[in-house]
Amino acid sequence: MTARNRIRSLLCKACSTAVLVALVSGQASLVQAGPREQAKRIHDRVAGVPPSEVVLDDMASDIESGRAIDAAFTAMQDSAFYDVTLKNFAAPWTNEAMSKFVPLNDYIATVIGLVRDGEDFRKVLYDDVLYIGNASLNLPNYSTSNNNHYESLENSGASLKDNLEREIQRSL
């Protein structure tokens, strides 16, 4: 083995060790965190916003009782999960540039509605369903020729969690 190869091998081992240490120490901080810190981190990641004290206490209690999944479902009840997290999750699928910075549209609204209603996610591919804004919001009518309905819904600031209604797509 030449000197250059030995140096390269030692550098690779050193880099690998450094990456491993960084990963392990990052995980260790989560393990060392108490239930409230874990609950806050889960809520921040899932909903993208800090939880209220009541929600934080509820989630911490779930975590302390070994029910971290229940804590995550609690975080999913925050409107920001639907308005931001799910919108950004589905948005890249709706445009060629795969950008999450696009206006709300029928596909994104339908993904959000199906998740909110606990439906089989595969239905987004085959079911005759479409989610539109609640009629009480006085939005422009749904149209297949423009996106005015969904852009107005998003601009209204209305919660997507509370204001999407399931419709039969072929009836619109």
How would you label these PLM feature ranges?
Residues 5-9, 28, 171:
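Positively charged, low-complexity intrinsically disordered regions
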Residues 13, 17, 62, 66, ...:
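Surface-exposed polar/charged interaction patches
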Residues 21-30:
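C-terminal segment of classical bacterial N-terminal signal peptides
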Residues 70-172:
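Extended surface/linker regions that mediate inter-domain or inter-protein docking
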